């Protein structure tokens, strides 16, 4: 496989893999794998037992028996506890039901298995300003076309806090909240950082539950991190509990 086929997001995921402590020949599901299945092929070249899955069957041309046609909004076609890791790049934002997807991933992961998700970072400062002005986040400059439903529509964009809640409710524990890449234009929005710092400090203090206050400290630290303020895409690494 030509490494030039990898997107900047897929490259970031691939570079992060050594830090995840996966065994050689670990079984990894890449879902959705996309029409060119570039990440699935790269995983195989790195020695992993990689399976690609997508609603678009064209990936079968490149993956052969290592491809499974699957609707990620439905029950996944694998038995329980079969994968060591699942990688989902730029997929969850296209799904109708995050919870059913995450619970299915939880089901097919082995105990202690790893889930890596990337998704547009609508928590980023640039995206927040776009929403303030237009009512739409950075990835969608105008309303979705209601007359022509498309699998690539961003129907499930979510903030970091929402994704954290969904993951924890689905049986995962977030280990890392990273970014895949940063565009230089994002630094122009640094002027808003002091306001965000002060606003979250005041807002989060209103929580009365001591256990949630502890969790809110984690959430606020993430919200004020370089990755969430400036990253184009989130990369969340979570572990099956």
Please give the residue ranges for each predicted region.
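S-adenosyl-L-methionine-dependent methyltransferase catalytic module, highlighting the catalytic core
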Residues: 4-6, 96-104, 108, 114-239
């Amino acid at each position: 496989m030509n490494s030039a086929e990898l997107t900047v997001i897929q490259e970031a995921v691939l570079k992060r893999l050594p830090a995840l402590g996966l065994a050689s020949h670990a079984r990894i599901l890449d879902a959705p794998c996309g029409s060119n299945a570039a990440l699935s092929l790269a995983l195989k070249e790195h020695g992993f037992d990689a399976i690609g899955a997508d609603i678009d069957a064209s990936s079968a041309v490149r993956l052969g028996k290592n491809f499974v046609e699957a609707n990620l909004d439905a029950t996944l076609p694998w038995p329980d506890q079969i994968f060591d890791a699942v990688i989902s790049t730029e997929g969850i934002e296209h799904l109708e039901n995050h919870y059913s997807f995450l619970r299915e991933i939880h089901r097919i992961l082995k105990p202690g298995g790893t889930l890596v998700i990337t998704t547009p970072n609508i928590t980023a400062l640039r995206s927040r300003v776009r929403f303030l002005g237009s009512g739409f986040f950075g990835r969608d400059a105008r309303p979705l076309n209601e007359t022509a439903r498309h699998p690539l529509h961003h129907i499930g964009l979510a903030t970091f806090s929402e994704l954290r809640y969904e993951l924890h409710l689905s049986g995962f524990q977030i280990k890392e909240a990273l970014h895949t890449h940063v565009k230089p234009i994002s630094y122009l929005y640094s002027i808003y950082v002091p306001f965000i710092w002060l606003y979250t400090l005041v807002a989060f203090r209103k929580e009365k539950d001591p256990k949630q206050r502890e969790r809110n400290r984690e959430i606020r630290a993430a919200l004020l991190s370089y990755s969430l303020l400036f990253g184009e895409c989130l990369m969340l690494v979570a572990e099956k509990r």
